[in-house]
Amino acid sequence: MADRKTKIIAVLPAYNAEKTLEKTLADIPRADIDEILLVDDASTDNTVALAERLGLPVVRHPSNRGYGGNQKTCYREALRRGADIVVMIHPDYQYDARLTPLLTGFIERGVCDVMFGSRIRTRAEALRGGMPAYKYFFNRALTALENLVLGQNLGETHSGFRAYS
């Protein structure tokens, strides 16, 4: 647990993450996070058993609520536990969890209220990292449209690696 006034909780919205959970968890800098919580969306593999074996607190959905429902539970539970900053890290290993302090640090210092990480620096890197080609295509198209409408130049607006105050 970090020695600071700000309570930072990492939430892992999981669905069938058994194969990548342990690797993701190993990369989260524990000194910079006060608590890690897994929210399982009715996985059919051994995600919950593995998370419990790894010592993670687990919130389980009895039935699949979908991606949005899982995120809502993550944020609601983190706030209930007293989080000042919530960082969401998908346990699918498409994001570099070692960068967590970069996301939370800007928020903790009052520079901004929200930080988004990105798994898309290059197409090849995203695809090698496990992102299906169709998801890459639609992610890029939707992000381009959103940038056009919002007048921004964001790299990825649908990131599973983000932090909020």
Where in this protein do the model-derived segments appear?
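Short, well-formed alpha-helical segments that are part of the catalytic scaffolds
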Residues: 15-30
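Acceptor/aglycone-binding surface of glycosyltransferases and processive sugar-polymer synthases
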Residues: 59, 63-80, 97-164
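A conserved acidic beta->alpha catalytic loop
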Residues: 40-48
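A short, conserved beta-strand element in the Rossmann-like catalytic core
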Residues: 42, 66, 94
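Donor nucleotide-sugar binding loop of glycosyltransferases
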Residues: 17-20, 43, 96
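Short beta-strand-to-loop acidic/aromatic patch adjacent to the donor-nucleotide binding site
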Residues: 83-92
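Conserved sequence signature across two-component system core domains
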Residues: 14, 39-41, 61
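Cell-envelope/extracellular polymer assembly enzymes that use nucleotide-activated donors
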Residues: 7-9
